[in-house]
Amino acid sequence: MLNQFSRTELLVGNEAMERLNKSRVAVFGIGGVGGYVCEALVRSGIGAFDLIDDDKVCLTNLNRQIIATRKTVGKYKVDVMKERMLEINPEVDVRIHKCFFLPENAEEFSFEKYDYIVDAVDTVTAKIALVMKAQKAGVPIISTMGAGTKLDASQFKVADIYKTKVCPLAKIMRRELKKQGVKKLKVVYSEEKPTRPFSDMAISCRTNCICPSGAKHKCTERRDIPGSVAFVPATAGLIIAGEVVKDLGIGV
């Protein structure tokens, strides 16, 4: 019988669709990358999700985040993403967590219940903690490296963290993961050299912050404000979603 996933099933088969439907994926960070991960995965038939983010939609998110519209500004990102996912598939199980994952609250999450973990957060401390906890639990994880300060979406690659180059965030991650004894980590990274922001615009963002009331990560509190465009983080998110689908459903 035809259903909303029939076109996907034509490509991957019934058994793969059943595996995807029975899988629970945790997405940490529902922003420019994570939002597109969720979008592609729910459209691919993943049956259950945990969404983790404590931030609210900001007007400055409209240039790149799939959850950002004029109507959603000021709303929690996880609330908006959940509503969108249920509109796509009313039967999907979506659990939301309005918090920012850090080593201090890592014990609040039981990673063993996840079939796959997506790291789409920005901070190194959180990324390292996610990788360590995922690998301890024996759950596959994929991490996004830097998607800001980029203009060429064609330069994204999938690789082990220790085979990455150019990306400044990947360099830091290689160093920190090596200290922790982590042997491997699948990542999506870009080999495009970062583009420096126009300094007057970066200063303007800090001094004229328009983040919504109650936002946890205001411009005034950020050390760096990277420039971004719609098509780069979206591409990274779609590549990550493809890796998750292949690993969970197709096994390639």
Q: What feature does the model see in each segment?
A:
Residues L41:
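Aromatic pocket-lining residues of Rossmann-like dinucleotide-binding sites
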Residues K98-A106:
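Conserved SAM/SAH-binding loop
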Residues V27-G29, I52:
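Conserved N-terminal Rossmann-fold NAD(P)-binding element of oxidoreductases
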Residues L2, F109-Y116, V121, A126, ...:
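Glycine-rich phosphate/adenylate-binding loop
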